[in-house]
């Protein structure tokens, strides 16, 4: 053994080839400070052994290296610039040391080689991957750029255009795509990875492969003619800004760094990368996006823990077909859990199967699936007009019409047809789980399972714990949602649960502005372009359906009359009474037609303005800051109330629910990250300015206490 540490081992193989193996004690290899120090020491040991003629890097895990240890980031990024600069320089000394070894080097890649893992393989002369490999630099998704030489080496290996596409998108690449652009040198079956890697290294040792020229290219300026460079970077800036927008600076910074470093050697190019990295690491966007990543890990960790308590789900059933039922059936079947789709009407079953087939066909067209896989998934969906195929299923998702009596009747009926230990859930967005549980003989095996529409796109599932729901029931539903590829958050029962409970105060703030004469299109523009929502409130209500919104609003008003009760007609009532339900009947706040791609196209409709003006009088203009304050303050305070009341367990889960369930702007991180960023005291002062607008604008006593103590919702790094 040449070197050994808890994360790395180096041994000598035949023909004087050293083998450096990453073998962390946890489930995956990642670059924390300890591993970087170990790699440095390992490389020193390798350099000192003059018998070594080549080096192979590999992993003892299912993945090569998944990246840097992001749990260290927030604390590190809070340090002074000089500390961050020193950390980057010390880490890059290690990667340079790997690149500068006096013999050929090769990475044998299995599974994920992402972020710092990708930067490791770029520092070697050759790269060979097996078919399980996924390679990429996802740092822009965290609001930063690669910091261990990724922006320097990748353009010199695969060309500037390809590197710009890889790094700005943050997507990981399949081995065939990586091979096509020259990021790797060969793709082999997993069992052939080691022998193929050793053969390639031996060819390099025998000078059949020119490793010195390859290495020299990585150390030199980019070989890109000046005019071509100008055109390439100008085009990239336009395309990337169109996708990333003004709220996400990291992708644009990547272009700037690669452009500036194009005429530089390695040392100077790395300094350019370091300076840009430090600048981005200090931004609120990076704090928010890293926070989302860490919150996502926390939520997934909870789901994994729930899996240990969960009842095994081998088969499922959804009651109620149609678009929603078809979406749930598709999601379950495509992730490997066979499902019965039961309805009382054949046309509804046809619609549900059609929805699943449509989604699968789209996957095949995009090259993400094959006709054979599509057939397998469709065969995993069993349509039924009676309960016979449902009786042996492990979990049932009731997804019939959103009406308490209908749901209660269906739940009582299905309980008579399933086994004693089958789990029963309701996909409801507003109806009390405790109320529905009264229709069951065994309420302990029942809870809510709220999917968001469209099911195949929306990552969140709210798992609603009723007062009688057992721990095993909740854990089993969480595990099933995870198996379906969803992110489950557990919430306690209350009107609207979590997501809808915090959404409708936002709509109330919007309605209040319209009652005071604001233009709904102007509000949408501010909330989309400035605050960063994917859709403004008027557009979102049109997409959700104003009939659905009107019903949910009534449920919320009944549940929280002191804050959400209405004294008169609002804009949602006006649209509902005029039978303007949104996209579903092509008229809501906006009017809709179908574009050339078959997608809904929205336009302004004079009738909407006439209806609103007749009810609320002449329009008047509002400043952007007031629009943001009057819509967001109610949502933020209601989110805090949910935490204080124990409806949601933690700020992390609340923020994930908002980002994944409502599209809360990721660069703001969620309500609690946003509060910490602007300061709780500043928010309280802002809310007090609008307190005269009613109960939705009244901050809680706990918020005032936190503000007085200069506190925060997340533990400060």
UniProtKB/Swiss-Prot annotation:
It comes from the Bacteria. GO terms for cellular component: fatty acid beta-oxidation multienzyme complex. Residues 311-717 are annotated as: 3-hydroxyacyl-CoA dehydrogenase. InterPro entries: 3-OHacyl-CoA_DH_CS (IPR006180), 3-OHacyl-CoA_DH_NAD-bd (IPR006176), 3HC_DH_C (IPR006108), 6-PGluconate_DH-like_C_sf (IPR008927), ClpP/crotonase-like_dom_sf (IPR029045), Enoyl-CoA_hyd/isom_CS (IPR018376), Enoyl-CoA_hydra/iso (IPR001753), FA_oxidation_alpha_subunit (IPR050136). The keyword Transcription regulation does not apply. GO terms for molecular function: 3-hydroxybutyryl-CoA epimerase activity; delta(3)-delta(2)-enoyl-CoA isomerase activity; enoyl-CoA hydratase activity; long-chain-3-hydroxyacyl-CoA dehydrogenase activity; NAD+ binding. Keywords: Fatty acid metabolism, Isomerase, Lipid degradation, Lipid metabolism, Lyase, Multifunctional enzyme, NAD, Oxidoreductase. Pathway: Lipid metabolism; fatty acid beta-oxidation. NAD(+) binds at residues 324, 343, 400-402, 407, 429, 453. It catalyses: a (3S)-3-hydroxyacyl-CoA + NAD(+) = a 3-oxoacyl-CoA + NADH + H(+); a (3S)-3-hydroxyacyl-CoA = a (2E)-enoyl-CoA + H2O; a 4-saturated-(3S)-3-hydroxyacyl-CoA = a (3E)-enoyl-CoA + H2O; (3S)-3-hydroxybutanoyl-CoA = (3R)-3-hydroxybutanoyl-CoA. Substrate binds at residues 296, 500, 660. Transmembrane segments: none annotated. Heterotetramer of two alpha chains (FadB) and two beta chains (FadA). In the N-terminal section; belongs to the enoyl-CoA hydratase/isomerase family. In the C-terminal section; belongs to the 3-hydroxyacyl-CoA dehydrogenase family. HAMAP family: FadB. This is Fatty acid oxidation complex subunit alpha.
């Amino acid at each position: 053994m040449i070197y050994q540490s808890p994360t790395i081992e180096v041994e000598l193989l035949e023909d004087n080839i050293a083998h450096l193996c990453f073998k962390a004690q946890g489930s995956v290899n990642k670059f924390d400070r300890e591993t970087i120090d170990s790699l440095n020491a390992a490389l020193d040991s390798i350099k000192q052994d003059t018998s070594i003629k080549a080096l192979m890097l590999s992993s003892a895990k299912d993945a090569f290296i998944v990246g840097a240890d992001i749990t260290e980031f927030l604390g590190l990024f809070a340090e002074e610039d000089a500390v961050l600069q020193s950390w980057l320089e010390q880490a890059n000394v290690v990667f340079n040391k790997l690149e500068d070894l006096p013999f050929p080097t090769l990475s044998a890649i299995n599974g994920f080689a992402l972020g710092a893992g990708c930067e490791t393989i770029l520092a070697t002369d050759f790269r060979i991957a097996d078919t399980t490999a996924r390679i990429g630099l996802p740092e822009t998704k965290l609001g930063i750029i690669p910091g261990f030489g990724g922006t320097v080496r990748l353009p010199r290996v695969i060309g500037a255009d390809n590197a710009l596409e890889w790094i700005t998108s943050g997507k990981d690449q399949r081995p065939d795509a990586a091979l096509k652009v020259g990021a790797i040198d060969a793709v082999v079956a997993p069992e052939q990875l080691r022998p193929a890697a050793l053969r390639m290294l031996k060819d390099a040792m025998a000078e059949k492969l020119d490793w010195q020229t390859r290495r020299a290219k990585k150390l030199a300026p980019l070989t890109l003619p000046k005019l071509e460079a100008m055109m390439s970077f100008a085009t990239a800036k336009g395309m990337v800004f169109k996708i990333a927008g003004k709220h996400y600076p990291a992708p644009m910074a990547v272009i700037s760094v690669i452009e500036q470093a194009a005429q530089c050697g390695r040392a100077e190019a790395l300094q350019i990368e370091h300076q840009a990295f430090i600048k981005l690491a200090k931004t609120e966007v990076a704090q928010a996006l890293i926070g989302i990543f860490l919150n996502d890990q926390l939520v997934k960790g909870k789901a994994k823990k729930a899996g240990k308590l969960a009842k095994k789900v081998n088969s499922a059933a959804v009651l109620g077909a149609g678009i929603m039922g078809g979406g749930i059936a598709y999601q379950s079947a495509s992730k490997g859990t066979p499902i019965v789709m039961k309805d009382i009407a054949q046309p509804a079953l046809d619609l549900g199967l059609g929805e699943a087939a449509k989604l699968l066909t789209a996957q095949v067209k995009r090259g993400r699936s094959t006709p054979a896989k599509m057939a397998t998934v469709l065969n995993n969906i069993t349509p039924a007009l009676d309960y016979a195929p449902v009786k042996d299923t492990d979990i049932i998702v009731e997804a019939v019409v959103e009406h308490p009596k209908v749901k209660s009747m269906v739940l009582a009926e299905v309980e008579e047809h399933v086994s004693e230990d089958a789990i029963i859930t309701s996909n409801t967005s507003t109806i009390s789980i405790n109320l529905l549980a009264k229709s069951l003989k065994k309420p302990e095996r029942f809870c809510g399972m709220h999917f968001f529409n469209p099911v195949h796109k929306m990552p969140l599932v709210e798992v609603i714990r009723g007062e009688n729901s057992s721990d095993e029931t909740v854990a089993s539903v969480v595990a099933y949602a995870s198996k379906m590829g969803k992110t489950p958050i557990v919430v306690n029962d209350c009107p609207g649960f979590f997501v809808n409970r915090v959404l409708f105060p936002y709509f109330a703030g919007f309605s209040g502005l319209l009652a005071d004469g604001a233009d709904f299109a102007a509000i949408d523009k501010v909330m989309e372009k400035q605050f960063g929502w994917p859709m403004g409130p008027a557009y979102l209500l049109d997409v959700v359906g104003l009939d659905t919104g009107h019903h949910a609003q009534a449920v919320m008003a009944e549940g929280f009359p002191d804050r959400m009760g209405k004294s008169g007609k609002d804009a949602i009532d006006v649209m509902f009474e005029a039978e303007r339900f949104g996209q579903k009947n092509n008229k809501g706040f906006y009017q809709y037609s179908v574009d050339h791609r078959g997608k809904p196209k929205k336009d302004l409709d004079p009738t909407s303005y006439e209806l609103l003006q007749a009810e609320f009088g002449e329009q008047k203009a509002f400043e952007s800051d007031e629009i943001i304050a009057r819509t967001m303050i109610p949502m933020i305070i209601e989110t805090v109330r949910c935490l204080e009341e124990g409806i949601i367990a933690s700020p992390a889960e609340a923020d994930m629910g908002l980002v994944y369930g409502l599209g809360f702007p990721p660069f703001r991180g969620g309500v609690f990250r946003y509060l910490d960023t602007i300061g709780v005291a500043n928010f309280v002062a802002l809310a007090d300015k609008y307190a005269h607008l009613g109960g939705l604008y009244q901050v809680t006593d706990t918020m005032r206490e936190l503000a007085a103590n200069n506190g925060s919702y997340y533990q400060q790094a």
